[in-house]
């Protein structure tokens, strides 16, 4: 079952990719994406001169829009170009170029008269990939996950308002977090656009209530690194990072094209109708980037297939590799990885499935290694907000009931209105 989807693929000597984007049950598509295999290619006489493969940089990005699609579309068309124009990029400092490029994208939108009254915004999860290194920049709650012999290694972390570090910046800038949202409105704390939260002239762009300033992760590629997945929260709200990696790995073992694996994952996540209340109804965009590491496409597929056949790393069950099979759906997540996993070996690589604390995300679980889960996904403040609202409403209702009991005639006259007010409060809570 597909709802207004589009897919594409490509490859060069360094990597191959497949992507798919689906509108889902939303009335409009607000996601955008970018896939550029040669970021430094020079245009001469109407044709492009390719960069030497040993020096080539590829760029991939997912931009999940909210409040409209204009900022997301601008980001999809321009972020990679803006990053490539940064002074740091020319000097080979890709990490700084990504940070500067995100902020420069905000400035470019502000300076464009077409966007003078624009209120929309978007997340940005992007990756620059060389022959032996990956840079991941993230602002918002789209996510980048590396598949390492079937194990999910997060290369980005969601920016949520209830995270202690994010909440501290929001408060210092004059904002607040209510029900897990910035000023009771925005469900993420970093984004491109959203200029209504960036109006403090005395503060730097990094200090605003909402900032486009990204976190950047740098990863040295090893032979165990098989692929990178970049996707918006339409995927991650339905599946854990580990389940996505296992699903992708099974599709590769079954020799499916990468864009087809993306399509199957989206069909798997898509709710059967629009009545589920959000999960499985969102726009979805997903990119899988295969890390060739000196291999041909065929050799890369064969290597992963052999690893799966030999039980080298976790993988989804064989039936998940069948083209007609759509996987577990949003109500049935994959189980944890096998108990014979070599924990010490994984620690030596800088991540660990077992050592991470289990964070509940939607209907699945997410393992966030080497991070403080209270800082990243602390729901306690949000829960306190909800509790305080409920206690306040209950106190009001108790006071109203006491007053009405003193005046029976008044109680009879106002009983209908009190019921309506209570219903509205319950709905809003």
Swiss-Prot record:
Summary of the knockout phenotype: Leads to increased phosphorylation of the HOG1-kinase sakA, and increased expression of genes positively regulated by the stress-activated p38MAPK cascade. Leads to increased phosphorylation of the cell integrity MAPK cascade MAP kinase mpkA. Alters the composition of cell wall constituents, and leads to impaired biofilm formation and increases sensitivity to the cell-wall stress inducers Calcofluor White and Congo Red. Decreases virulence in a neutropenic murine model of invasive pulmonary aspergillosis.
Cofactor note text: Binds 2 magnesium or manganese ions per subunit.
GO molecular function, one term: protein serine/threonine phosphatase activity
Binding residues annotated for Mn(2+) 2, in chain numbering: 64, 233, 282
One GO cellular component term noted in the UniProt record for this chain: cytoplasm
Catalytic activity of the protein: O-phospho-L-seryl-[protein] + H2O = L-seryl-[protein] + phosphate; O-phospho-L-threonyl-[protein] + H2O = L-threonyl-[protein] + phosphate
PPM-type phosphatase domain location: 16-291
Top enzyme category: hydrolase
Originating gene: ptcB
Disordered as annotated region, ranges: 320-348, 384-429
Protein name: Protein phosphatase 2C homolog 2
Residue ranges with Basic and acidic residues bias: 384-397
Family of the protein in this entry: Belongs to the PP2C family.
Statement: the UniProt record of this protein carries the keyword Heme: no
Role according to the record: Dephosphorylating regulator for many key proteins. Dephosphorylates sakA, to negatively regulate the stress-activated p38MAPK cascade.
């Amino acid at each position: 079952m597909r709802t207004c989807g589009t897919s594409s693929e490509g490859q060069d000597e360094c990597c191959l990719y497949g992507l798919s984007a689906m509108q889902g049950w939303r009335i409009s598509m607000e996601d955008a994406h970018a896939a550029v295999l040669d970021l430094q290619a020079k245009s001469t006489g109407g044709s492009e001169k390719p960069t030497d493969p040993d020096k080539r940089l590829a760029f991939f990005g997912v931009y999940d829009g909210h409040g409209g699609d204009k900022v997301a579309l601008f980001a999809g068309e321009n972020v990679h170009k803006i990053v490539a124009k940064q002074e740091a990029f020319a000097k080979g400092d890709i990490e700084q170029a990504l940070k500067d490029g995100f902020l420069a994208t905000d400035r470019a939108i502000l300076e464009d008269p077409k966007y003078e009254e624009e209120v929309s915004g978007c997340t940005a999860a992007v990756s620059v990939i060389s022959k032996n290194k990956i840079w991941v920049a993230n602002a918002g709650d789209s996510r980048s996950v590396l598949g390492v012999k079937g194990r999910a290694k997060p290369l980005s972390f969601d920016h949520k308002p209830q995270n202690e570090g994010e909440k501290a910046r929001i408060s210092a800038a004059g904002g607040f977090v209510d029900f897990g949202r910035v000023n009771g409105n925005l469900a993420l704390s970093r984004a491109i656009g959203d200029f209504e939260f960036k109006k403090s002239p005395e503060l730097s762009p990094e200090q605003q209530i909402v900032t486009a300033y990204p976190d950047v992760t740098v990863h040295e590629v090893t032979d165990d690194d098989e692929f990178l997945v970049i996707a918006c929260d339409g995927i991650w709200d339905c599946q854990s990072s580990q389940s996505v990696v296992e699903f992708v790995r099974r599709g590769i073992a079954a020799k499916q094209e990468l864009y087809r694996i993306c399509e199957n994952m989206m069909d798997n996540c898509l709710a059967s109708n629009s009545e589920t209340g959000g999960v499985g109804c969102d726009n979805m965009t997903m990119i899988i980037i295969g890390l060739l590491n000196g291999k041909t496409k065929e050799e890369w597929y064969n290597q992963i297939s052999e690893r799966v056949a030999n039980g080298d790393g976790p993988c989804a069950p064989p039936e998940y590799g069948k083209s007609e099979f759509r996987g577990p759906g949003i109500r049935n997540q994959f189980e944890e990885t096998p108990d014979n996993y070599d924990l010490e070996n994984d620690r030596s690589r800088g991540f660990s499935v077992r050592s991470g604390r289990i964070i509940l995300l939607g209907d699945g679980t997410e393992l966030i290694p080497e991070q403080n889960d209270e800082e990243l996904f602390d729901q306690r403040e949000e829960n306190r907000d909800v509790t305080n609202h409920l206690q306040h409403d209950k106190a009001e209702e108790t006071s109203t009931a006491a007053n009405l009991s003193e005046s029976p005639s008044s109680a009879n006259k106002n009983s209908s209105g009190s019921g309506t007010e209570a219903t509205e409060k319950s709905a809003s809570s």
